[in-house]
Regions:
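Conserved donor-binding/catalytic core segment of Leloir-type glycosyltransferases
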Residues: 217, 225-236
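A short helix/loop element that forms part of the nucleotide-sugar donor recognition site in Leloir-type
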Residues: 49-51, 208-224
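Acceptor-binding helix/loop patch of EC 2.4 sugar-transfer enzymes
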Residues: 8, 67-74, 97, 125-160, ...
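N-terminal subdomain of nucleotide-sugar transferases
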Residues: 1-51, 55-58
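A conserved catalytic-core segment of Leloir-type glycosyltransferases
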Residues: 37-94
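Carbohydrate-associated surface elements
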Residues: 175-178, 198-201
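Membrane-proximal helix-turn-helix segments that form the acceptor-binding/catalytic region
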Residues: 117-121, 152-174
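Short N-terminal targeting/anchoring amphipathic segment
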Residues: 58-60, 90-111, 120-130, 171
Length: 236
């Protein structure tokens, strides 16, 4: 099976490192599938568009503008041009590959044209959205956008793109039951049967070796009790 994965994550230089996307890529690879990844190579890296092949994993780094950690103007232009750059890279380097699954995650919500292009070339492929963030609603919750006024124009624009992304997706994987419920309730045009739970992918090691005394040192450094369990909330 050939899997196409579109992502904004630039941390894919070494797929053997632990991460929600690298772990997922390795799982597909280890099950005997070919994985084709398209990700941005931001301008600050000064690297060209390039494809690397590593044991059934094909990494296409597409040269883009800076889309993270930059000013709003470049970030906006970067997002606008990203679809075209990804589409051109996909056509040039993976144009002859027949994909069975088209996988992509949010953010961003601006991959619709790339996905539509990939589905047109691969009409039998299944498109699957990994819905990590519900945007633009999360921007409203954070006070970045509003539903009225000038910012409301941006909200409605992004809301339309969000709905377009849902519409083109054969399946939508959400982080939690509450997210599933939210997506269905606020997008009644979506068939509830295609919305399901798909939490972060993580390859849990069978054992973790920790040098003696290291944990006590870390607890002391941050003023945490030595003899009590510590729970860390990761945000999802």
């Amino acid at each position: 099976m050939n899997v196409l994965f579109l992502t904004m994550s630039s941390g894919l230089k070494n797929i053997e490192t632990s991460g929600i996307y690298t772990d997922l890529i390795r799982k597909f690879r280890d099950e005997g599938h070919e994985v084709y990844v398209v990700y941005p190579r931001e301008r600050r890296l000064r690297l060209p568009t390039e494809v690397k092949h590593e044991d059934r994993v094909h990494l296409l780094g597409v040269k883009t503008l800076n889309v993270t950690k930059t000013n709003l103007i470049e970030k906006g232009l970067g997002q606008v041009t990203l679809e075209r750059q990804f589409k051109l890279g996909l056509e040039k380097y993976f144009g002859k590959v027949k994909f069975d699954i088209i996988l992509y995650s949010t953010p961003p919500i601006t991959f619709t044209k790339v996905i539509r292009y990939a589905k047109k070339r691969n009409p039998k492929a299944v498109s699957y959205l990994l819905l990590k963030d519900i945007f633009p609603q999360n921007a409203v919750d954070l006070g970045i956008l509003t539903k009225d006024g000038l910012k409301g124009v941006l909200y409605r624009l992004f809301r339309k793109k969000e709905k377009d992304l849902y519409r083109i997706s054969d399946y939508i994987g959400c982080m939690s039951p509450a997210n599933v419920k939210y997506v269905i309730e606020h997008n009644p045009e979506i068939d509830p049967a295609v919305v399901e739970i798909a939490p972060n992918s993580y390859d849990i090691p069978s054992e973790i070796s920790v040098e003696y005394g290291v944990t006590d040192h870390i607890r002391q450094k941050y003023g945490l009790p030595i003899n009590k369990p510590i729970f860390i909330y990761g945000g999802n």
